[in-house]
């Protein structure tokens, strides 16, 4: 399959990474390969480690990047960065990039079930080898569990009604497709609320996808691990697409920049030293032009930190 993946905040991310031609870089979310390609264009004797837990993404990007020989493809989760680098006998790297959330090629591949705009089986797995899918969440979670997931990960104010309607509907039979779920969500949200804001199913689909792929679980620890494997002056650039992810990135960077746990008015005795300097005091947002040509970029935020 040919992926028409448009990389978000591409120019800004590459500029902030300060790429050295001889450096070692990690793209922890290879996706359609757009960011990786721009990194590779700037390398001479350097190397890129391209990681994705979606094997389809790796296959597609291998084709796109076939002219480059200095790439190591790894089918794994970026959260395992330490183990991945150890297996490659790499101690430190010069820069790391993460483009979080679902990628446009995953949305475009209808049968994966990520999109609420196309009918497909209830799947949403980024790793197709995982035994746990959106079908399990929708058909097996209790009403209470569903409400928690939709409220917590979707920040959906109608979470209680949506969970109730899902449970009621599945009494008639299994919920097998995305359009079945979209219809249930539409029925659960009052008509007046449906008329404004984004697609009524957007938040619930986001919530289920995050639950299925454990997207937020251990993200803070993964960022800390990545900073640990960075060389001094090396940078980590992270693109997020919703407030939950962005909050984790922002708070983790802050903690690494100011790890001191002493009371504010007292001299520091805890001995915890800053590990990074935050380069982007405010997140970098896409330009109006980018939003016009790539609607996926609308909610994107880029944050960058530099290892001290």
Swiss-Prot record:
One of its GO terms (biological process) is rRNA base methylation. One of its GO terms (molecular function) is rRNA (cytosine-N4-)-methyltransferase activity. It comes from the Bacteria. S-adenosyl-L-methionine binds at residues 33-35, 52, 78, 99, 106. Its EC number is 2.1.1.199. InterPro entries: RsmH (IPR002903), SAM-dep_MeTrfase_MraW_recog (IPR023397), SAM-dependent_MTases_sf (IPR029063). Residues 289-308 are annotated as: Disordered. NCBIfam families: 16S rRNA (cytosine(1402)-N(4))-methyltransferase RsmH. This is Ribosomal RNA small subunit methyltransferase H. It comes from Thermoanaerobacter sp. (strain X514).
